[in-house]
Swiss-Prot record:
Region (Disordered) location: 1-45
Subcellular location: Cytoplasm, Cytoskeleton
One GO MF term attached to the UniProt entry: actin monomer binding
Species whose genome carries this gene: Homo sapiens
Sequence similarity: Belongs to the thymosin beta family.
Protein name: Thymosin beta-15A
C-alpha cells in the first residue's frame, strides 16, 4: 500500500448530482445588550 490517497474517485466526481441546501444559523451569538445584562447580573451576585 502506498501512503498517497486514491484520487480516482475524486477526479470523476460529478458535482451536478449534489443538491442545493439552504443553511440555517443555529448557534447565533448573543447581542451586546444580552452580554451586558449577564455581566451586570454576575457582578451583583
Amino acid at each position: 500500500m502506498s501512503d498517497k490517497p486514491d484520487l480516482s474517485e475524486v477526479e470523476k466526481f460529478d458535482r451536478s448530482k449534489l443538491k442545493k441546501t439552504n443553511t440555517e444559523e443555529k448557534n447565533t451569538l448573543p447581542s451586546k445588550e444580552t452580554i451586558q445584562q449577564e455581566k451586570e447580573c454576575v457582578q451583583t451576585s
